[in-house]
Amino acid sequence: MATRKAQEKRESEIQDRTAPPGDVVYEAIYREGEHELERRTSALTLSGLAAGLSMGFSLVTESLLRAHLPDAPWTPLITKFGYSLGFVIVILGRQQLFTKNTLTVILPLLKEWKVALLLNVARLWAVVLIANLLGAFIFAWLLAHTNLFDENIRRVFTEISMKSMAPDFVTILVRGALAGWLIALMVWLLPFAETGRLWVIIIIAYLVGLAELPHVIAGNVENFYLLSSGSISLGQAFGHFLVPSLIGNVIGGVALVAVGAHAEFTVADD
């Protein structure tokens, strides 16, 4: 009897220390996607607006760190940790972030292709994207038109934001695909990260920031700051940055991760 209990305890410990199978992770994300698709438009809007506002803290924190550090080659290694803060707030706070939904809600659609489900995914994407961008714009406008921060910090806002606008359309699109890929992989890793969830978010968001990969929400806080301060035109804000970063993030999140993961586990099941 004692031997059996010891064996059961040992098996339990082995299971606790073993990474969950990929199909279990897939099913967890799939069910989360189903839950998101059942949410009302009003709830998605409010959560998406909160997420857009929260992402503004990525620019603020990175700028505050940069303003208090010397201009040295190693400075971004520290300041880009600030870029992670917006993602930490949004994801741990379970707010609706557009790039997160490119993975979760697309899995149910890929498994059961129906017009009604496609329209529901389109509804969720549109509502969350618009709410995120509205929140990002409000935050950026407040930074540009209030005295929340002194002139020195606002100058850093401009420097960081102008750097994100420097690449051409194609470069922003391709880099955006890499950003979408990484954020979707973050979502894939989170369900069973348990106590390591915070570090998963920080490390991946830090990599996105350090590599200067454009994120359609975090990056558009910077974009909208320049627009609100009169540094760029409306055409530049939308045509040069918003459009390519959006396309790139969707390609990375859907084509490179969601479709690949779906194919891997559905083919295995068949």
Predicted regions and their residues:
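Alpha-helical transmembrane segments and their helix-helix packing motifs
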Residues: A2-D270
